[in-house]
């Protein structure tokens, strides 16, 4: 699964343009990679005292193990079109009778990304009779300022299975982020699971707590929200006029690297392609001296292990802690032969007289095919899953720079 070409489910994919000022904030930068890692009984592992959202860990496991069948009908196609998955753990919540209010800090949703899918996932034990619940979604950076995003109604009933209840909030986020409108809709979506706790209060209880039932106990909210209430946003970085793969360095150090305009780059000459079916000898006037028969080192791929801890990125990278990026190496082997993976220019240049040291240049042994890598990292109290292009060398070849 050429994942992301990688990441996430597609439901609604209108471009994410201007973001309301109330949602503008820090940018989602820094990427980190993920390798398969051990999980605890509840499906999460501690990282700087934080628990991984179970869904994010499960999603990563599905990606690296290519388990397409474990993804929903929405998540599978979106994963093919997205390159970033962000998870937002609920900062707090209130429950008054059949009225649910959830608060998230969505400041890091980038205006450079195209929204693909937004899912609200709630996993609570269920009991009681079937009843309707109104759910309101708010954006908040602190408890003082709260921005209403939208609401929907859904029917809650008891269930025996262990699935979480999943709501598609793509329209809610899109409607507000793009148009600045709140979305209030009944029967918004048919949920995937049926496992919300029946928190309906008695009439006496409702009257007693008419004011504010915000859960203030931090330990309770943290434990509850980390595994129970999570907003997952699937997105793709908006392509530029002349698209280039997103740079890991530019995302890590945006102030250090300028976003140069590549539109005026001169296109390289289209190189001639040799007819490999017919071995045609080229007449260069003078036959170059035959080299001494010896085993010349080819342009080859060798190991290059990257340890994120050693380069100072270990504090926020979740998976992998290290990986083999590989590199290309070769001695200066001239003239090249037809079996070498080289450009026509490199081949012609290597036929120059070996005695002409001033005109003799060694072709560069460089990566000619790269592979992407999925990465999981912890940034600004959020777990982010991102797909980065050109992270691992697949093939090496001779090339003139």
UniProtKB/Swiss-Prot annotation:
Residue ranges listed under propeptide: 19-274
PROSITE patterns: TGF_BETA_2
Leader sequence residues: 1-18
Sorted UniProt keywords: Cleavage on pair of basic residues, Developmental protein, Disulfide bond, Gastrulation, Glycoprotein, Growth factor, Secreted, Signal
Annotated InterPro entries: Cystine-knot_cytokine, TGF-b_C, TGF-b_propeptide, TGF-beta-rel
Glycosylated residues (UniProt): 168, 337, 344
Compartment(s): Secreted
Organ and tissue specificity: Expressed in the dorsal marginal region of late blastula, becoming restricted to the Spemann organizer at the early gastrula stage.
A GO-annotated cellular component: extracellular region
GO molecular function: growth factor activity
Gene3D superfamilies, sorted: 2.60.120.970, Cystine-knot cytokines
Disulfide bonds: 299-365, 328-396
Listed GO biological process terms: gastrulation
Assembly and binders: Monomer. The propeptide region interacts with bmp4 in a non-covalent manner.
Comment field on protein domains: The propeptide region is both necessary and sufficient for bmp-inhibitory activity. The propeptide region and the N- and C-terminal thirds of the mature protein are necessary for neural induction activity. Although cleavage doesn't appear essential for activity, residues surrounding the cleavage site are necessary for activity.
Physiological role: Exhibits mesoderm-dorsalizing activity and neural-inducing activity, but lacks mesoderm-inducing activity. Regulates the expression of specific mesodermal and neural genes. Induces convergent extension movements at the embryonic midline by activating the fgf signaling pathway to induce t/bra expression in the organizer region. Acts with wnt11 to induce Spemann organizer cells and induce axis formation. The unprocessed protein antagonizes bmp-signaling.
The family this protein is said to belong to: Belongs to the TGF-beta family.
Name of protein: Nodal homolog 3-B
Source organism phylogeny: Eukaryota, Metazoa, Chordata, Craniata, Vertebrata
Gene symbol of the encoding locus: nodal3-B
């Amino acid at each position: 699964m050429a994942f992301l070409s990688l990441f996430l489910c597609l439901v609604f994919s209108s471009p994410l343009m201007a973001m309301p000022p109330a949602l503008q904030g820090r940018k989602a930068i820094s990427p980190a990679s993920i390798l398969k890692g051990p999980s605890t009984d509840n499906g999460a592992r501690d990282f700087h005292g934080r628990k991984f959202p179970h869904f994010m860990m499960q999603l990563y496991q599905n990606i690296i193990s290519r388990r397409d069948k474990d993804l929903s009908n929405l998540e599978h196609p979106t994963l093919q079109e997205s390159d970033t998955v962000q998870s937002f753990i609920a900062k707090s919540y209130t429950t008054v009778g059949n009225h649910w209010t959830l608060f998230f800090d969505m400041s890091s949703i980038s205006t450079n990304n195209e929204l693909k899918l937004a899912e609200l996932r709630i996993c609570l034990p269920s009991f009681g009779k079937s009843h309707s619940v109104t759910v309101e979604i708010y954006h908040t950076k602190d408890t003082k300022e709260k921005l209403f995003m939208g609401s929907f109604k859904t029917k809650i009933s008891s269930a025996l299975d262990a699935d979480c209840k999943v709501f598609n909030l793509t329209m809610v986020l899109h409607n507000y982020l793009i148009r600045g409108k709140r979305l209030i809709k009944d029967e918004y979506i048919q949920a995937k699971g049926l496992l919300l706790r029946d928190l309906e209060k008695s009439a006496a209880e409702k009257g007693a707590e008419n004011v504010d039932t915000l859960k203030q106990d931090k330990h309770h909210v943290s434990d509850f929200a980390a595994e129970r209430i999570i907003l997952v946003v699937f997105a793709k970085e908006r392509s530029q006029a002349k698209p280039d793969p997103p740079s890991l360095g530019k995302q890590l150090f945006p102030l250090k690297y300028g976003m140069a305009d590549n539109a005026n780059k001169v296109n390289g000459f289209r190189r001639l392609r040799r007819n490999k079916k017919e071995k045609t000898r080229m007449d260069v006037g003078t036959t170059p001296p035959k080299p001494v028969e010896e085993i010349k080192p080819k342009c080859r791929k060798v190991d290059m292990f990257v340890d994120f801890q050693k380069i100072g990125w270990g504090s926020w990278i979740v998976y992998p802690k290290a990986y083999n990026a590989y590199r290309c190496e070769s001695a200066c082997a001239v003239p090249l032969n037809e079996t070498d993976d080289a450009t026509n220019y490199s081949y012609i240049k290597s036929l120059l007289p070996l005695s002409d040291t001033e005109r003799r240049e060694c072709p560069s042994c460089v990566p000619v095919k790269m592979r992407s890598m999925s990465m999981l990292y912890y940034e600004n109290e959020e777990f982010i899953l991102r797909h980065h292009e050109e992270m691992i060398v697949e093939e090496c070849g001779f090339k003139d720079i």
